[in-house]
Each structure stands twice: as structure tokens, then as C-alpha cells.
Amino acid sequence: MPTFKYDKLVRDNIADWHVQSGHTLVTYQLTKADLLRALVGKLHEEADEVSASETHDSLIEELADVQEVLMAIAKHAGITLDDIEAVRMAKTNRKGGFSKGVYIESVTMPNEDDKWVQYCRQSPDKYPEISE
């Protein structure tokens, strides 16, 4: 009999579907802390699937999965969708959205004391400093 390793968080009804199909599962219930880690891992999995989507319909399906995981993370953390929307709108009003498609390749800052120099240097993996 073929056995496949899943080793991942699944939607609530998936295990029942397997049992109804006569499959034998090895499962366990995640602790609250482990569930949050698993949800974050699931978010990465679903984001990868968004990236791999090749049709409009599959993109919609994968975006719905991302939204479901985001909603589960928020619920787990005691955050409401209204909380998220309020912060999203505030950030959009202050920083803008992504509709213009601006992609910054590099930024040269003429002043060492600029607050952005310190900001970038605090995250060298994210913002590597380019030597000329």
C-alpha cells in the first residue's frame, strides 16, 4: 500500500475526506504555539502556489487560500479584519499602494546621518550596502 508523507497543516475537512476514502492517517492536534508556526508555514506554501499559478482561475483559487490563512492567523492572534483594514488604509494613505509599479533597484544617500542609512544598515540581508 502506498504511503505518502504530508507533514503539513491541512484544512479542517481534509482529514475527514481521507478517512471517508478508506485511508489511514497519522495525525495530531497542534498546540496553540505550534498552530501559529504552522499557519505561517502554510502562508509561505500558499504564496508559492500564487507565484506558480498559470491561469486566472488558479490565481483566484490560490489568492483565496492565502486570504483564508491570513484570516486564520488573525483569528489566532485576536486580530479582527477591521483592525487589519484600518492599518491597511492608514499605510496606503501614508505610503501609497502598489498600483504604479515602482521598483527601486538601489538608493544612493549622500548624507551618512540620514535616518534611512541607519534603517538600511540595520537589515543588511534585506538592504545590502553596495561598494563602489
Regions found by a protein language model. Name each.
Residues 1-132:
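Flexible "arm" and connector segments at domain edges
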